[in-house]
Swiss-Prot record:
Record note on cofactor: Binds 1 zinc ion per subunit.
Zinc finger extent (FPG-type): 260-296
Catalytic activity: Hydrolysis of DNA containing ring-opened 7-methylguanine residues, releasing 2,6-diamino-4-hydroxy-5-(N-methyl)formamidopyrimidine; 2'-deoxyribonucleotide-(2'-deoxyribose 5'-phosphate)-2'-deoxyribonucleotide-DNA = a 3'-end 2'-deoxyribonucleotide-(2,3-dehydro-2,3-deoxyribose 5'-phosphate)-DNA + a 5'-end 5'-phospho-2'-deoxyribonucleoside-DNA + H(+)
CDD domains noted in UniProt: EcFpg-like_N
Protein name according to UniProt: Formamidopyrimidine-DNA glycosylase
Cofactors demanded by this protein: Zn(2+)
InterPro entries hit by this protein: DNA_glyclase/AP_lyase_DNA-bd, DNA_glyclase_Znf_dom_DNA_BS, Formamido-pyr_DNA_Glyclase, FPG_cat, MutM-like_N-ter, Ribosomal_uS13-like_H2TH, Znf_DNA_glyclase/AP_lyase, Znf_FPG/IleRS
Length: 296
């Protein structure tokens, strides 16, 4: 499933293609994705101008000129592609040679841009993604967002904040980091990578990173820095392409070539001088990769 860096990459790819354009028609080629589309969805979007794109956690946000925001979640296999006029406007004939089967094109944004007509197509073979619509003023209280913690890239995330959340918690550290109420948008891949960078075991209790007085230990400061760094590195690399993720220009993210522990079971740990081996365990139904030698 695309994680925060992948969704951020998609947002950055779509912004120059969609921002400032008018939706001449929203074409729905079926009645639902994972969930049914909102009532009168096509009518409510058609004719509107897109004033901006954003992201919250793993959700893509498309702001319209009437004060509404379209919410899109990519699910397991969702992706967008951009087409100029009747042909692709991206290098490599992405939508012909590199796209998924066009029979899985479920939503088409027909756009009028200053340069001419354009289409942005949502493709989703597994149909595990979904779309919704909400007034921008109500976004923070929408069920998708009201319980989310701070973004891992924002100033709200700090060691002091996590100390408050983790204090006296026996919950495994990895599980605490994946809890979207603690940090929004942080997923399995990047939690594994951040824990490796900060030399912390995924199975240790989250509360052990907090002093008896409730202050963050130095290890928690290092963890916050590692989270920021791994997310920034992944965004710079275009995200990770595992199974189904494709960027809007058809290219594949390549941060997976920089994985230090994720999906490296039985391989040598990359911490200099460690000498350990990457192990795989299962926590809450998800694979965890870590080095028991240097992650404590």
């Amino acid at each position: 499933m695309p994680e925060l860096p992948e969704v951020e990459t998609v947002k950055r790819g779509l912004t120059p293609a969609m921002e400032g354009t008018r939706v001449t028609r929203l074409e729905l080629r079926r009645g639902d994705l994972r969930f049914p589309f909102p009532d009168a969805f096509a009518d409510r979007v058609s004719g509107r101008t897109i004033v901006g794109l954003g992201r919250r956690a793993k959700y893509l946000l498309v702001d319209l000129d009437d004060g509404n925001t379209l919410i899109s979640h990519l699910g397991m296999s969702g992706s967008f592609r951009i087409e100029e006029g009747a042909a692709s406007g991206v290098p490599g004939e992405f939508h012909h040679a590199r796209s998924k089967d066009e029979k899985h094109d479920h939503v088409v944004f027909h756009l009028q841009a200053a340069s001419g007509l354009r289409r942005v197509v949502y493709n989703d073979p597994r149909r595990f993604g979904f779309m919704d619509m909400v007034g921008r003023a109500d976004l923070a209280t929408h069920p998708f967002f009201r319980d989310l913690g701070p973004e891992p890239t924002g100033n709200e995330l700090s060691a002091a904040y996590l100390a408050e959340r983790f204090r006296d918690k026996a919950q495994p550290l990895k599980s605490a980091l994946l809890d979207q109420k603690n940090i929004a948008g942080l997923g399995n891949i990047y939690v594994c990578e951040a824990l490796w960078r900060s030399h912390l075991s995924p199975i240790r209790a989250a509360g052990t990173l907090v002093t008896a007085g409730g202050r963050p230990k130095a290890q928690l400061d290092l963890l916050v820095a590692s989270i920021r760094d791994v997310i920034a590195d992944a965004i710079a690399a275009g995200g990770s392409s595992l199974r189904d993720h494709i960027q809007t220009d058809g290219s594949l993210g390549y941060f997976q070539h920089s994985f230090s522990v994720y999906d490296r079971e039985s391989q040598a740990c990359r911490t200099p001088g460690c000498g350990g081996t990457v192990a795989r365990i299962v926590q809450a139904g998800r694979s965890t990769f870590y080095c028991a030698t240097c992650q404590k």
